[in-house]
Amino acid sequence: MAGYPTNGSVYVSNLPLGTDENMLADYFGTIGLLKRDKRTGTPKVWLYRDKETDEPKGDATVTYEDPHAALAAVEWFNNKDFHGNTIGVFMAESKNKNAGDAVEFVEFDGGAEETNGGAGRGRGQADSSAKPWQQDGDWMCPNTSCTNVNFAFRGVCNRCGTARPAGASGGSMGAGRGRGRGGGADGGAPGKQPSGAPTGLFGPNDWACPMCGNVNWAKRLKCNICNTNKPGQNEGGVRGGRGGGYKELDEQELEETKRRRREAEEDDGEMYDEFGNLKKKYRVKTNQADTRPAVAAGRAGWEVEELGIDKDGRERSRDRQRDRGRDHHYDKDRRRSRSRERERGKERDYDYDHDRDRDRDYGRERGSRYRN
């Protein structure tokens, strides 16, 4: 049953008095993500209780999201101390293979004989989940998302690179039930773990994932369940980039950047931002200053700009007033010339009429003289 589990449920026996669902969820949740009830949202942990007294009977079932996590729980938690009692942890078996989720959790009378392969009657047969090419000493990767079976000579998993745990052995994976082919290294020692098994599951430097609560080994920089970064670790340092991205800058580099910025400002007299770009307002004022003569020192740039604007405005107003004065004098002179021309015309008409009358009188006098 250890190679490819069909479900993610494990059966736990010999629990001490006072055990509740939260204690089991905290303990078994350290190796994998527990499945949650869709209605209540709580981890799927079931304590068997007496029908009459409603007291816990000392056994329970725990369901994982990943069946391989359940397999790892059997490997790590079986025959371990839990609040003073040595508990038994076994894979759950379906009562009916076609019944879907209907699972019967079987209590084993002989401790771990049924799982580890005790001396049975008959020829026996190798576990159906065991690989035919497996040999004594082969070991399974402890990474619950990998569970690759590696040859005995490998020190790390050839699929995910996880280090081989101390005392890991795959002998139980080839164990048969009874005598016969497939009898593994643990076949004659029912209820016992390999001699080199680690005494504890996690060390003091192992860390719990802040997202899913999974406990990871100290060497991991990411959670092996949800890929969340280890607390205190990030991929690129401080987000100091212009777009909020990662940008690693040490103190020496910052000082060098400031020094170069000061040198650039002293060379061309312009202001730069922290990224080395010319500031916009100083860029505009520099262009305006190029088109105007220099102003007396000691005034700020904006004061120079405002004075220049006021000066130009006053000059324009003077020009407009001067133009208006010229137009006024021109109109006045034109009106005067017109009045003079009219007066001269009147004088000419008067002189012409006077001369004509005088000639007429002279003609009359001559005519009367000749008649007499």
Curated annotation (Swiss-Prot):
Function: TAFs are components of the transcription factor IID (TFIID) complex that is essential for mediating regulation of RNA polymerase transcription.
PANTHER family per record: TRANSCRIPTION INITIATION FACTOR TFIID SUBUNIT 15B, ZINC FINGER RAN-BINDING DOMAIN-CONTAINING PROTEIN 2 ZRANB2-RELATED
The protein's name in its UniProt record: Transcription initiation factor TFIID subunit 15
Keyword Coiled coil annotated: yes
Assigned keywords, A-Z: Activator, Coiled coil, Metal-binding, Nucleus, Repeat, RNA-binding, Transcription, Transcription regulation, Zinc, Zinc-finger
Any Gene Ontology CC annotation: nucleus
Compositionally skewed regions (Gly residues) per UniProt: 168-190, 234-244
Region span, Disordered: 111-136, 166-199, 229-272, 285-372
Entry's localization field: Nucleus
The keyword Repeat belongs to this UniProt entry's keyword annotation: yes
Quaternary structure note: Component of the TFIID complex. TFIID is composed of TATA binding protein (TBP) and a number of TBP-associated factors (TAFs) whose MWs range from 14-217 kDa. Interacts with TAF4, TAF4B and TAF12B.
Stretches of the chain forming a coiled coil according to its record: 245-272
Expression by tissue: Expressed in roots, leaves and inflorescences.
Gene Ontology molecular function: RNA binding; zinc ion binding
InterPro entries: Nucleotide-bd_a/b_plait_sf, RBD_domain_sf, RRM_dom, Znf_RanBP2, Znf_RanBP2_sf
Highest taxon of source: Eukaryota
Pfam families named in the record: RRM_1, Zn_ribbon_RanBP
Ranges annotated as RanBP2-type zinc finger: 135-166, 203-232
Basic and acidic residues compositional bias, start-end: 245-264, 308-372
Membership in a protein family: Belongs to the TAF15 family.
Broad class of where this protein is predominantly found: nucleus
Taxonomic source organism: Arabidopsis thaliana (Mouse-ear cress)
RRM domain residues: 8-94
